[in-house]
C-alpha cells in the first residue's frame, strides 16, 4: 500500500484545494472534507507527511498525460518504417495535386501509423481533411502537429483555415497571428489574417448582417435616394422601361433598336455609379471590400 501513498497524497491535496474554493456550497465543501478524512484514515496519511508530495500538482499531471496520449514514443519508429512513411507522404501529396483528397487522407494516415511523431504528416492530413470539409478532424490534426512541434507555423496556418471555415473567426485570428509570429514574411498568413479579422468585425457588429457592404445604409442614404430618383427621371431610362413593359405584355419586339436601348441603360447606369463614387466614395469602397472578401482562398501553399 505504501507504493500508492504518493498518489493518494496528491488526490488529498487536490481535494483540499477544491474544498477551499468559493465555487462550492457549504454542504459540498463538507462532503469534500469527509472524503479527505476517509482517505487519510484508510491509507494512514496525515497533512504532516510532506515527504509524499510530488513535484507536479495532480491536475498538471493529468493534463500532460492527456496531451501525450495520442502520441507514441519515438522509439516505436524504426528506420524502415520512417522511409516507408515518407514514401506514403509523397503519395499523399500527389493525390492532393490530383484533388483525390480521400486517398490523400488514407496515405497520410498510413504514414502516421508508421511514424507517429512526424508533425508534417498530421499537418498534411489536416489540409486533406479541410478539402473534404472535415474541419473538426483538420483542427485535431493541427493540434497534434503543434504538440509535436510547437514552432510549426504551417500547422497554425492550416488550423486558421479550418477555424475560419467553421466561422470561429476569433480563434482563427489567434491561429494566424501565431503563424505570423513564427513566419512573419508569409503573405498567405497575412492575407488570411486580414480576412478573419474582417469577418470577426462583421459578426461582432450590431447589425450582425455578416456583410461588409451595408445595403441598409446605402438604401437609407439621402444622397443615394436623390441619385436614384434622378436616374428614374432620365428620359433614356424611362423610354427603355416603357419598351420593356410593352414587350412584357405582348407588344411589338424591340428589334434592332433593342441593342440601342440596352446601350442607353448601360450608359445611364455608368453615370449613376459615377455619381455615387463622387458623392459617397466610402460606400463604393465598402462594396469593393465585400467583393474582395468573397474571394476567400483555402490556401495555395505547397505541401511538405
UniProtKB/Swiss-Prot annotation:
SMART domains in alphabetical order: TPR
Residues where Phosphoserine is found: 293, 295, 297
Gene3D superfamilies: Immunoglobulin FC, subunit C (1.20.5.420), Tetratricopeptide repeat domain (1.25.40.10)
Alphabetical UniProt keywords: Acetylation, Chaperone, Phosphoprotein, Repeat, TPR repeat
GO molecular function terms noted in the UniProt entry: Hsp70 protein binding; identical protein binding; molecular adaptor activity; protein-folding chaperone binding
Tissue expression summary: Expressed specifically in brain.
Positions of post-translational N6-acetyllysine modification: 131
UniProt xrefs under InterPro entries: SGT, SGTA_dimer, TPR-like_helical_dom_sf, TPR_rpt
Role this protein plays: Co-chaperone that binds directly to HSC70 and HSP70 and regulates their ATPase activity.
Subunit structure: Homooligomerize.
Protein name listed in UniProt: Small glutamine-rich tetratricopeptide repeat-containing protein beta
Lineage: Eukaryota, Metazoa, Chordata, Craniata, Vertebrata
Amino acid at each position: 500500500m505504501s507504493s500508492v501513498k504518493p498518489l493518494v497524497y496528491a488526490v488529498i491535496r487536490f481535494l483540499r484545494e477544491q474544498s477551499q474554493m468559493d465555487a462550492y456550497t457549504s454542504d459540498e465543501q463538507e462532503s469534500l472534507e469527509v472524503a479527505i478524512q476517509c482517505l487519510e484514515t484508510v491509507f494512514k496519511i496525515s497533512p504532516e507527511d510532506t515527504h509524499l508530495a510530488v513535484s507536479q500538482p495532480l491536475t498538471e499531471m493529468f493534463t500532460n498525460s492527456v496531451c501525450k496520449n495520442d502520441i507514441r514514443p519515438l522509439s516505436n519508429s524504426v528506420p524502415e518504417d520512417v522511409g516507408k512513411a515518407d514514401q506514403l507522404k509523397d503519395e499523399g501529396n500527389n493525390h492532393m495535386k490530383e484533388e483525390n483528397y480521400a486517398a490523400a487522407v488514407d496515405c497520410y494516415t498510413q504514414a502516421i501509423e508508421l511514424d507517429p511523431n512526424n508533425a508534417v504528416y498530421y499537418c498534411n492530413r489536416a489540409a486533406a481533411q479541410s478539402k473534404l470539409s472535415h474541419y473538426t478532424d483538420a483542427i485535431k490534426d493541427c493540434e497534434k502537429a503543434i504538440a509535436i512541434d510547437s514552432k510549426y507555423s504551417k500547422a497554425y496556418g492550416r488550423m486558421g483555415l479550418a477555424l475560419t471555415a467553421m466561422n470561429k473567426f476569433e480563434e482563427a485570428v489567434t491561429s494566424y497571428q501565431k503563424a505570423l509570429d513564427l513566419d512573419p514574411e508569409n503573405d498567405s498568413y497575412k492575407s488570411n489574417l486580414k480576412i478573419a479579422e474582417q469577418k470577426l468585425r462583421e459578426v461582432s457588429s450590431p447589425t450582425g448582417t455578416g456583410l461588409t457592404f451595408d445595403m441598409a445604409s446605402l438604401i437609407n442614404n439621402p444622397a443615394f435616394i436623390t441619385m436614384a430618383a434622378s436616374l428614374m427621371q432620365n428620359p433614356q431610362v424611362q423610354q427603355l422601361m416603357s419598351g420593356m413593359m410593352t414587350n412584357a405584355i405582348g407588344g411589338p419586339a424591340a428589334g434592332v433598336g433593342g441593342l440601342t436601348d440596352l446601350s442607353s441603360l448601360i450608359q445611364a447606369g455608368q453615370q449613376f455609379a459615377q455619381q455615387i463614387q463622387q458623392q459617397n466614395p466610402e460606400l463604393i469602397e465598402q462594396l469593393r471590400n465585400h467583393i474582395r472578401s468573397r474571394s476567400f482562398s483555402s490556401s495555395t501553399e505547397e505541401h511538405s
